[in-house]
Amino acid sequence: MTAPALKPATTLLVIAKQPVPGRVKTRLVPPCTYEQAAALAEAALADTLQAVLLAPAARRVLVLDGEPGPWLPPGFDVMPQCGGPLDERLAAAFAAMSGPALLIGMDTPQVTPDLLAVDWQAADAVFGPAADGGFWALGLRVPDPALVRGVPMSTPATGAFQRARLLSAGLRVADLPQLRDVDTAADAVAVAAKAPQGRFAARARALAAVLSPVATGKGATGKGVIEASALRETA
């Protein structure tokens, strides 16, 4: 007799802002307008949510600053973010969980479902480092907000500090691959090239003439145009 398949135990959380012009991806302005930056943010969020939908999970939660929009697919519970600095908001999200939870942001649209499949028998925590020194994923088998609260955020040492916090608590840490956050025009071009089939890449291709010259530092003409052409060719 075949044993029944185990149900996924992980709650997958996405912490995000409503993609409103002037509130998201402001480091893309310039070269983008606020509206273009928000469109890139919405596409990144849509790709992220799609990856979460395709990953094994007991529950999927959007921890949202703002209001849901047409970019939110069915299958997610929506939990409002609390106020305060980022470490407090992350801590509050984990505090609301009763079992294993993996939290990611909206800045890595290249994430794939397989990266979000966690083997909790082999790990007490999951850590995904970001190229800028932060982290793109944090998972806890036993959610403990104290493991996040007080971690200095948005610094080049944030990721190292957070990982050291996990290790100092005696946790077995499973490391995920490093991913690049989308914060700048150069980030947008690089990430779009890594995941050319997604909505983020399509939006970046539409804005290639804006993004690529700045990303390469070549100006609007000359060699910078090569990058714009490369983005269009991946369509």
Language model features: what each stretch is:
Residues 72-102, 155-158:
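Short phosphate-binding loop-to-helix
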